[in-house]
């Protein structure tokens, strides 16, 4: 059962300075190992052997530990007090966990006192306390909706989560603040969190920047930037290179021309033309190259966070997919950089890696005994739950709100699959992963608008469909998922027991 405790205070070492002449003299004699009474010199003790870094990067909670993770939380109304079993069965998973994590996708504020422009997703002041009461301990904030209502919405959400006692990572007043790990001090130990976002090109204005001297930096997200590379055949790449040469061949007599790179100095299988990269690969797909500095500094933050905690979660909000033409709402395939990022994060000390952002579920992988969730889907999905002021601000081209703007199923082009998700319950014992249970959830695509997007236990036929999908997506990753009583079960350790009835 989840307990709550105040954050542990830091213990700051006290440094005593020897300020007097006598003190300095004594210090000098001791430092040189000289006994003034006998003239005997003392051997200085050998320095202690450096600690094995692996001990600091290991899972340090030996007691049984249950971590529950969910995907995106876009919430206007939590429904936490709804007594129907299909709701409470899901909420109980969150409450009973030792640690509960989700991605706080929308924004929160006290709307009566909010001074920013109202646009996009905004929940009222009672949402954060309700999420806390439901069991949320840690939330990611690095995502593409933090500036829906400009920077004011980011700061108001920070204030709301702080007041509710929910630790959060991924945004801040500058990049140092946004990239720093957050911590939750629970009964089983301290849990750290580093939150990242791989922004789309249009969203880089939300990227936080470093402070420099008296310049405070720009507020925003902890971004992991990247280059997109479109894959083409070798013949197509040669044609692109020829087109580039032709485009940059000036008429005779032209001065001050732009010089192309020396073809001999370029990679044979890759070229950039008009700001777009191309390389030889499978046509119709794209690859991603992470920014080296962003990757290095995020891994450093994960490593530092693990040094200061007993358990570490690394998380990334990612909308990218490998298939160029696939609509972003339905990208169930994993882009090539995500496994690299997840495994480097685990090698840097993360005990689990959680991806959110895809509006559908993806597969699960186990790497070195640590879980990687490549797509958790939508937990709360309440775009449509907006006050009239927010509606008019979100869709100014529509004038007055009507049925097509209020019903997100019409206005956003969503499908039932976007409302079929899961809750992951991960169990550790003696610092080792033992078992993962996947509980399917439904956002009630066929239900009334007032309850659309509220998470509830999926009915049996839908549960089987969701689990079969995750099972198929996980198989190429080397993960076997058993489906028992409408629950997906991944058994890792010998202590894992058969499922005895799901959410009862």
Feature locations, PLM:
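Acidic, metal/ion-coordinating pockets
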Residues: 23-26, 30, 34-504
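Bacterial N-terminal signal peptides
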Residues: 13-25
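N-terminal Sec-pathway targeting helices
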Residues: 4-15
């Amino acid at each position: 059962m989840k307990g709550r405790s105040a954050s542990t205070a830091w213990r700051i070492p006290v440094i005593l300075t020897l300020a007097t002449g006598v003190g300095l003299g004594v210090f000098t004699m001791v430092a040189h190992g000289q006994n003034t009474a006998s003239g005997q010199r003392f051997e200085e003790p050998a320095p202690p052997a450096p600690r094995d870094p692996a001990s600091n990067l290991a899972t340090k909670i030996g007691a049984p530990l249950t971590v529950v993770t969910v995907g995106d939380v876009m919430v206007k109304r939590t429904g936490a007090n709804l007594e129907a079993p299909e709701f409470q069965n899901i909420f109980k998973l969150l409450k009973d966990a030792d640690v509960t994590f989700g991605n706080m996708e929308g924004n929160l504020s006290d709307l009566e006192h909010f001074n920013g422009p109202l646009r996009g997703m905004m929940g009222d002041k009672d949402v954060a306390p309700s999420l806390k009461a439901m069991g949320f301990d840690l939330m990611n904030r690095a995502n593409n909706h933090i500036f829906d209502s400009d920077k004011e919405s980011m700061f108001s959400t920070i204030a709301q989560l702080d007041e509710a006692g929910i630790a959060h990572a991924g945004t801040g007043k500058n990049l140092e603040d946004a990239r720093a790990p957050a911590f939750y001090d629970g009964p089983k130990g301290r849990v750290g969190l580093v939150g990242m976002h791989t922004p789309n090109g249009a969203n880089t204005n939300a990227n936080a920047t470093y402070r420099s001297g008296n310049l405070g930096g720009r507020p925003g997200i902890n971004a992991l930037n990247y280059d997109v590379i479109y894959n083409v055949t070798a013949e197509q790449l040669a044609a692109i290179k020829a087109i580039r040469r032709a485009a940059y061949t000036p008429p005779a007599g032209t001065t001050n021309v732009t010089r192309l790179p020396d073809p001999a100095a370029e990679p044979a299988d890759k070229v950039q033309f008009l700001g777009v990269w191309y390389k030889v690969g499978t046509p119709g797909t794209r690859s991603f190259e992470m920014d080296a500095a962003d990757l290095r500094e995020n891994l450093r933050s994960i490593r530092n966070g693990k040094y200061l905690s007993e358990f570490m979660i690394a998380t990334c909000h990612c909308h990218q997919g490998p298939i160029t033409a696939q609509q972003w709402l339905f990208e169930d395939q994993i882009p090539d950089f995500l496994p690299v990022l997840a495994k480097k994060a685990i090698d840097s000390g993360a005990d689990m890696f959680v991806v959110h952002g895809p509006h559908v579920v993806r597969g699960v992988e186990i790497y070195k005994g640590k879980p990687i969730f490549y797509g958790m889907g939508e937990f709360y999905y309440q775009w449509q739950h907006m006050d009239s002021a927010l509606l008019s601000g979100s869709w100014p081209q529509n004038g007055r709100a009507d049925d097509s703007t209020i019903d997100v199923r019409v206005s956003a082009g969503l499908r039932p699959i976007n409302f079929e998700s899961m809750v992951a319950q991960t169990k550790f014992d003696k610092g080792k992963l033992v078992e993962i249970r996947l509980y399917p959830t439904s956002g009630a695509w066929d239900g009334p608008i007032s309850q659309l997007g509220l998470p509830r236990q999926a009915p049996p036929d839908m549960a089987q469909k969701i689990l079969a999908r995750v099972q198929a997506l996980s198989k190429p990753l080397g993960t076997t998922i058993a489906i028992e009583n409408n629950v997906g079960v991944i058994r890792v350790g010998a202590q894992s027991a058969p499922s005895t009835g799901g959410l009862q």
